[in-house]
Every structure is written in structure tokens, then in C-alpha cells.
Curated annotation (Swiss-Prot):
The keyword Glycosyltransferase does not apply. SMART domains: HOX. This is Pancreas/duodenum homeobox protein 1. PANTHER family: PANCREAS_DUODENUM HOMEOBOX PROTEIN 1 (PTHR45664:SF12), PROTEIN ZERKNUELLT 1-RELATED (PTHR45664). One of its GO terms (molecular function) is RNA polymerase II-specific DNA-binding transcription factor binding. The Antp-type hexapeptide mediates heterodimerization with PBX on a regulatory element of the somatostatin promoter. The homeodomain, which contains the nuclear localization signal, not only mediates DNA-binding, but also acts as a protein-protein interaction domain for TCF3(E47), NEUROD1 and HMG-I(Y). Its main location: nucleus. Interacts with the basic helix-loop-helix domains of TCF3(E47) and NEUROD1 and with HMG-I(Y). Interacts with SPOP. Interacts with the methyltransferase SETD7. Part of a PDX1:PBX1b:MEIS2b complex. The modification Phosphoserine is found at S268. One of its GO terms (cellular component) is chromatin. It is linked to Pancreatic agenesis 1: A disease characterized by isolated hypoplasia or agenesis of the pancreas, pancreatic beta-cell failure resulting in neonatal insulin-dependent diabetes mellitus, and exocrine pancreatic insufficiency. Type 2 diabetes mellitus: A multifactorial disorder of glucose homeostasis caused by a lack of sensitivity to insulin. Affected individuals usually have an obese body habitus and manifestations of a metabolic syndrome characterized by diabetes, insulin resistance, hypertension and hypertriglyceridemia. The disease results in long-term complications that affect the eyes, kidneys, nerves, and blood vessels. It is found in: Nucleus; Cytoplasm, Cytosol. Pfam families: Homeodomain. It comes from Homo sapiens.
Length: 283
């Protein structure tokens, strides 16, 4: 019961924090009373409901728990060894900081300072071949270890590929996978082979077409048309001799349509004055 009475008495005391500060206040105060600020603050937590347990803890630790004693660092042999070598290292003079070491020329760089290619796959390409010929020499020409070699096809593989190309100039993806499994090749090898084979086939076709047009198909040249027949002026200047019997030359109708006929010729054929001879009957 004593604990409960102390608890309730404490709570009543904390309910009115200004109880001990009530008194005659001065008429003119420079600042408001402190109880106003104390009233705004949250009340402190109530005391522990079991004061006996707290008192036991405050008295001390149980006798069976002994405090841990930390050994001094000087007794540790490893720490003593470090202390033995530490002054010697601190006594070493620091090298002078400068842009270049002593005895080195500014234009010469050391081997570890050379710029290396960051990725190994960059060695397999020829994109950095110019660095070996550069006068600066910062980039050293490295041998191309991972250079891609040319694929050597066997006769059986070439035979199957040629047979497939004979039927299909453009291979499909499922058929390409099937050929890759059957011929023990990759899809990329088959794709590249078909691309090269198509280019070769197109060149052969172009060569065949070019040879046929140069010969002229059957190898027979077409006769050229005479320009004197199509020109009417040249026909008037050089009239052909009339054939016997007064027949009109074949070029006369063309000249008659144009309205230009040589003298002695007419558009219509004239009857011959000489009658044809009849064959004599046998007696």
C-alpha cells in the first residue's frame, strides 16, 4: 500500500507543475512566468510500478557476474612488435614531390604508364593497327591472338550445300537449322556460304548475258538500210536509168506521192508501144 500511495501522490504532484511556484508575482515582469512554458511541455513518464526491482538493480550487479578486465596493450607481443617498427617508418624521409623523377627526361614515359586496351575483344579487330605506326609510341602494336580463321568445308559439306542451293537460292531459317545440325556447322557459316554463293551465281549469270548480246543472238548481223533510198532529193539528183520496156522504177511511187518526179516519168505505168510476141505454133 505504501507503493500505491507514493504513486498517486506523485501523479497529483505532476498534474499541477506550478503549485510550488505560486506566489506574489511582481506587478511589472520582464518575461512571463516559467510555469506557462512548463505547462506546455509533455509531462514526464510516471515512475516504475515496481520500485523494488529498480532498487535491486541500482544496488549493484549480482555477485556471480564478474566484470571483464581488458589486458593492457603493452602485454601483447604483436602490438609491441608494431611499436618497435613504427618509429623507424616514421623517421624515413618522404621523397620530394615533383612532376618527373630524378634523372628522367620529361618526354620519356615509363613502361607501366602506357595506356593499355581496356577490353580483350578489342585485340581481335584491326581498328587499333594505326597505333603501332604512331610516332608517339604510347600504343604498342599487339599481335592479334584471336584473329578469326577461315572456315574449311569438307567435300561432303560442300556437296550438300550445293544440292540445297540448286533447289533454293534463299534458304529459310528452319532449313538452315536443319542443315547446321546435319553438317555439324553453325547457322552463321551456312548463312555466309549462301550469301557468297548467290554473289558468285549472279556474276556468272551477268557474264552469260553479256556474251550473248555481244554476238547478236544468232551471230548474224542485220543489213543496214540505204540512206539514198529514203532521201527524195538525192533521188532527183541521181535518177536511176529506166529499165527496158518503159517500166516505172520502184522508187517512182514514193517520189510521185511527194510531187517530185523526174522528166519523162509518170505516176501511172504507161502501156508499152511494143506488143509482146506470141509464140509460134509448130507446123
Amino acid at each position: 500500500m505504501n507503493g500505491e500511495e507514493q504513486y498517486y501522490a506523485a501523479t497529483q504532484l505532476y498534474k499541477d507543475p506550478c503549485a510550488f511556484q505560486r506566489g506574489p508575482a511582481p506587478e511589472f515582469s520582464a518575461s512571463p512566468p516559467a510555469c506557462l512554458y512548463m505547462g506546455r511541455q509533455p509531462p514526464p513518464p510516471p515512475p516504475h510500478p515496481f520500485p523494488g526491482a529498480l532498487g535491486a538493480l541500482e544496488q549493484g550487479s549480482p555477485p556471480d557476474i564478474s566484470p571483464y578486465e581488458v589486458p593492457p596493450l603493452a602485454d601483447d607481443p604483436a602490438v609491441a612488435h608494431l611499436h618497435h617498427h613504427l618509429p623507424a617508418q616514421l623517421a624515413l624521409p618522404h621523397p620530394p614531390a615533383g612532376p618527373f623523377p630524378e634523372g628522367a627526361e620529361p618526354g620519356v614515359l615509363e613502361e607501366p604508364n602506357r595506356v593499355q586496351l581496356p577490353f580483350p575483344w578489342m585485340k581481335s579487330t584491326k581498328a587499333h593497327a594505326w597505333k603501332g605506326q604512331w610516332a608517339g609510341g604510347a600504343y604498342a602494336a599487339e599481335p592479334e591472338e584471336n584473329k578469326r580463321t577461315r572456315t574449311a568445308y569438307t567435300r561432303a559439306q560442300l556437296l550438300e550445300l550445293e544440292k540445297e542451293f540448286l533447289f533454293n537460292k534463299y534458304i529459310s531459317r528452319p532449313r538452315r537449322v536443319e542443315l547446321a545440325v546435319m553438317l555439324n556447322l553453325t547457322e552463321r557459316h551456312i548463312k555466309i556460304w549462301f550469301q557468297n554463293r548467290r554473289m558468285k551465281w549472279k556474276k556468272e549469270e551477268d557474264k552469260k548475258r553479256g556474251g550473248g548480246t555481244a554476238v547478236g543472238g544468232g551471230g548474224v548481223a542485220e543489213p543496214e538500210q540505204d540512206c539514198a533510198v529514203t532521201s527524195g532529193e538525192e533521188l532527183l539528183a541521181l535518177p536511176p536509168p529506166p529499165p527496158p520496156g518503159g517500166a516505172v522504177p520502184p522508187a517512182a511511187p514514193v517520189a510521185a506521192r511527194e510531187g517530185r518526179l523526174p522528166p519523162g516519168l509518170s505516176a501511172s505505168p504507161q502501156p508499152s508501144s511494143v506488143a509482146p510476141r506470141r509464140p509460134q505454133e509448130p507446123r
